[in-house]
Each structure stands twice: as C-alpha cells, then as structure tokens.
C-alpha cells in the first residue's frame, strides 16, 4: 500500500494570470507557497482487475469491474480520470481525502491530482520531474475533466515551498524565493488565515474570466495585467528579505482581483474585509478564484489577537498557518511496518 501526501497552497499575488488563455498572449506570474494542510491518497493493488475509488470528503464510492468500464462521476472524478489518462489497467483501490475542503480556495483539487499522478508513477516504477507531474495533473483537470483552470495549483503543489512562477507561452519557470530565515518566520507570523465557513464552485467564476479574456474584455485584461505587475513587484520585495510592503501589495492585488469578473466577491466578503482593515489588518485577499473559501490577512503582531477575536466573533474560523518546503511525498506502508506486499 502506498500513501501519498501533497500540500495545498496559498497564492499571494498573480492569481488568474496562470490561465493559459491569458498568459499565452499577455504573460503571467504568481507568488505562492505551500502550507501545512495536505491532501492524502492511499492506493492498494488488487488481485483482480477491478477499479475502486472512495472519497470520504464527498461520501462517494465508485467501482468498475475493469479498466475499459471506468466512468467519470462526481466525487471520484479525480481518481477515475487519472487512471484513465495514465492508462493504468491493473486492479486498484484508491482513497482520496484532504485537510482543506474542495472549493475552499487553497487549490485542493490540483493538489489531489498531483498527489495521485505522483503515486501512480511511483507504482509503475517511473521517475518523473516536478514539471512533468504538474503538467500531467493540469492536463487531466483541464483536458479530461474540462475544468476552466490555470496551472498554479499543480505547479505549486508539485514543487513545494515559496516560489515565484513565470508563465509564458511554451515556457514556465519556477524560481524559489529565498529569504533570511528570521524574515520568513516574521512573514509567516504576520499572516492570518480565516475560513468563511462555506465553500464555492470556482468553475463558474473562472469560466466567466476565461470568457472575458477570449472576448478581450478591457476591464478583465487590464486587471490581470495589473496583478501580474504586482506579482513581479512582490517577488522583487521578498527576494530582498523586505516585507514592509507586503500588506499593501496584498490589498492592491485584492482590489484589482475584484474587477476580474462578477462573483469574485460579494457584500458579506466586502464587509468582513473592511472590518479586518478597521481592526489591524494592513491588507489581505480572498484565496482562490473568489466567491468564498478563505480570507488571508497581513497583520502586525500587536494587532493579531484583536483581529482574531473580531473575526471569530462573527463566525469565521481561524486556521493556523505554516509554510512548508516539500512537494508530494510517498510512503510505502509495508516498508514502514516491515511487512511484505505479497
């Protein structure tokens, strides 16, 4: 039995510019990090040719007697699509779950796909690069499942750590952001993450953004170009181990993101954001495509306690936040306990 662990992410700047429809014409970039919330995938080979997938998060179970009978159904679609795309025809059981719910703005679906792709490659004894794993996971989400997604979730989870990722047509470059350890710790300590208590379907919002890009909607294009510039500026600031401007850059990026398309924000989110600014937050953003999920704020240490109290009092959940450096990891359970797979 193999167990895979792959981290989810927080994008600080540039989200939306990772859509191929945008960056292949205009170029894009993101600043993002993996965090200590994970997706988990367990796979076990079977003695027959059956395929079986379980998703405790969605309370879904799917079984097919053999490879050519596998269909893609809601709740277990990631497992089915990965197996079909990679043409893994042996019998297998797959269980998928995560710390962060799908639709919470932390890139859970992309991280789950990266996780399972990496596991199947390991099961086949194939060594693959971080880039290839990310690209394969993206193709499964975009081409097989027809999700209107960008590439940041897959790349961030596959590479792990705090990175600046440049998106150009036919070229994607991942640049690790190396800061002094005390500055990285200070940045992490100054960030507060809150769960709004409701998830959302990002496909509707992203589909509208893709439509706007294809139609060359000036408001959308100009906003995306602005967040791309902010992402580059944030990268320049962070690589100098300077975080003084970080909160303001988050705020600028959020104000630009709200102009991407309808549905990115709503009155409830706007009121919470304004309340946070009134109680110590320098800046912040909604994680993911928008509409719900998590709110991230940059706050000076002396203001953190008050901000946490204010936002939890109105029903938000404070989520502990810790940066991580690793991408997907694989554990062979039988090797760990000294047993045998036979």
Feature names for model-found ranges:
Residues 106-126, 130:
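DPxDG-like acidic metal-binding loop motif
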Residues 65-73, 103-110, 127:
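Short gly/ser-rich anion-binding loops that grip negatively charged ligand groups
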Residues 1-13, 17-24, 30-32, 40-88, ...:
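C-terminal nucleotide
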Residues 292-294:
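Glycine-rich active-site/cofactor-binding loop and its immediate structural neighborhood
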């Amino acid at each position: 039995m193999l167990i895979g662990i792959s981290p989810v992410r927080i994008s600080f700047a540039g989200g939306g510019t990772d859509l191929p429809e945008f960056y292949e014409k205009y170029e894009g970039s993101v600043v993002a990090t993996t965090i200590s919330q994970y997706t988990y995938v367990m796979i076990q080979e079977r003695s027959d040719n059956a395929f079986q997938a379980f998703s405790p998060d969605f309370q879904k179970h799917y079984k097919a007697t053999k490879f050519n009978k596998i269909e893609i159904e809601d709740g277990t679609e990631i497992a089915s699509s990965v197996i079909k795309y990679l043409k893994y025809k042996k019998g297998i059981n797959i269980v998928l779950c995560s710390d962060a719910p799908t639709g919470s703005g932390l890139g859970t679906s992309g991280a789950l796909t990266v996780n399972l792709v990496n596991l199947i490659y390991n099961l086949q004894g194939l060594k693959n690069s971080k880039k290839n794993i990310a690209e394969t996971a993206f193709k499964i989400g975009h081409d097989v499942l027809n999700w209107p997604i960008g590439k940041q979730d897959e790349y961030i989870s596959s590479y792990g750590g705090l990175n600046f990722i440049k998106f150009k047509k036919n070229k994607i470059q991942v640049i690790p952001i190396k800061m002094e350890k005390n500055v990285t710790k200070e940045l992490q300590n100054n960030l507060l993450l809150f769960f709004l208590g409701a998830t959302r379907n990002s496909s509707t919002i992203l589909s509208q953004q893709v439509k706007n890009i294809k139609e060359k909607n000036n408001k959308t294009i100009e906003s995306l170009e602005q967040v791309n510039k902010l992402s580059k500026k944030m990268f320049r600031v962070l690589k100098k181990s300077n975080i003084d401007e970080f909160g303001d850059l988050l705020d600028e990026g959020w104000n630009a993101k709200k102009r991407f398309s309808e549905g990115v924000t709503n009155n409830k989110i706007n009121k919470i954001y304004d309340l946070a600014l009134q109680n110590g937050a320098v800046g912040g953003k909604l994680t993911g495509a928008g509409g719900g999920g998590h709110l991230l704020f940059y706050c000076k240490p002396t203001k953190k306690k008050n901000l946490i109290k204010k936002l939890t009092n109105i029903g938000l959940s404070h989520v502990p936040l810790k940066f991580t450096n690793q991408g997907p990891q694989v554990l062979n359970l039988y090797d760990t306990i000294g047993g045998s797979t036979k």
